[in-house]
Amino acid sequence: MGCFSYRGAAAVVGGVVALAVTSAFAITPNKLVSGGLPAHTGSTTTDYLTDGYLTNWKSSNAKEIALNVGEGPKKLLINWESYGDCAWATDFTSGCGHTGVALSNFKILTSANSTDGTDGDWEVAATIENNPVMARGVLIDFAGKSWFKFVSEGDVGKLLEIEAFDMTDGGTDTWFFMGTSLSQMGIKQQETDSTTAQLIHARFPNYTPAMLRGGIGCINSTEVVAHLDEYLKYAGNVKYWAIEMGTNDAWGGGDWDLDAYVKNMQTIIDSAKARNITPIIARIMATNPEKSGWQINPAFLEAVDKLVEDNKLPKGPDFYNYFLEHPELLGNDGVHPNADGGGQAMHHLWAEALAPLYAASDSSKSGGSKQDSTTTARKVARWTKVAAPRVSVRGKIIDVSDIALANRGVTEVSLVTAIGTVVEKIHASSNTVRFSSNINAGHYLVVVRNAGRYSVSKVVVR
């Protein structure tokens, strides 16, 4: 099962989240410091390795890749995403055959005096050996340094993205999206309007989530447990596991594997907590019975709800009810998210479910009490479905019209790069605004916020 391609306009998932969030789940930001920087690959440079998108045909097999993130961070978390067939690992399940070459054997070097990524003095900050997974993060010391460089041995495969985050303050905004083929095909779609991380950043500008995609087609909870040591080895250094799991356990509509599923999920939860990882579990995605011939047994949904309640976990997205109401976002098999908005909806639903954590974290950092944090989370986490404005591009000018102005308060329209940099922010007094300064070719998001309403539109400048 491979990645889907989606080229869409704006979409906003509406709803109300009323989760009581306390400071126990407070998130410490880790600033993205590599977004949009040129990646030096010998005699050439490229920007698609740092543009925030996993475009399949824009990959690199260079054996040396260097980035200058500048001085300042004392520690860096360096994430990378490889293509493969979009599965996180190739041999964790017997149900599907997966292929792809992971970035397996390489060193990460750092320099304080390089000028172009090749000259200067370099030190080994990390050595990675026999890595089998397509997405991973490594923490390195970076005090006094300005450059880091991947130096690979052997086949590099297809490298899609490199991200570096400043971990000087002990950032905990780190995420691993464990899942089945639904996440493999949805969360790792080669192009969607915006990722969960981008949506969170657009709404909470102090945060730039470090996001690893871990979907594997055909995997079930029993196979996850069988490979928990590998999950913890290669994705155990993040703070949050965003888990989509259960479709293959519940396949066919019966409940014959329910007991095993509950036992396995509890094992996953316990193992994550033992490593100080907070698991957040999505409700299993509904099928389209007219095409699949079956539906998720309600007993599995009740089991997910009970696991969340009994373990006092933050609530994950309700994939079941959303896709039950939107079967048009499922593919021809009636099970998997399609390329015409299915993966896009998954990103939005995850962002909506996680918003209370960020709202509570913002409130706690501003000095509010625990009660205030909960109240703020309930208030900020309301997403009202609104029509996206009309966006047009003429050369390097972006016009935004048909903006729904707030009856009270300020309507804020922001132009944000795909990797989270705010280019310009305008307080709109009419339903039309224009962005014309510092606009280069690339992918952008137009974000409108007002009176609890929120929309995101994607735009490309050629």
What name fits each language-model region?
Residues I187, T196-A197, T222-V262, S271, ...:
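Oxyanion-hole/transition-state-stabilizing segment in secreted/luminal serine hydrolases
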Residues K188, A250, T287-G368, D372:
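Catalytic His-Asp segment of secreted/periplasmic serine-dependent ester chemistry enzymes
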Residues V380-R462:
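C-terminal outer-membrane/trafficking sorting elements
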Residues G35, S59, A87-T168:
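Trp- and acidic/polar-enriched beta-sheet ligand-binding modules for extracellular glycan
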Residues A26-G72, E81-D91, G97-A102, A112-G117, ...:
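Disordered, acidic Ser/Thr/Pro-rich linker "stalks" and the adjacent N-terminal cap
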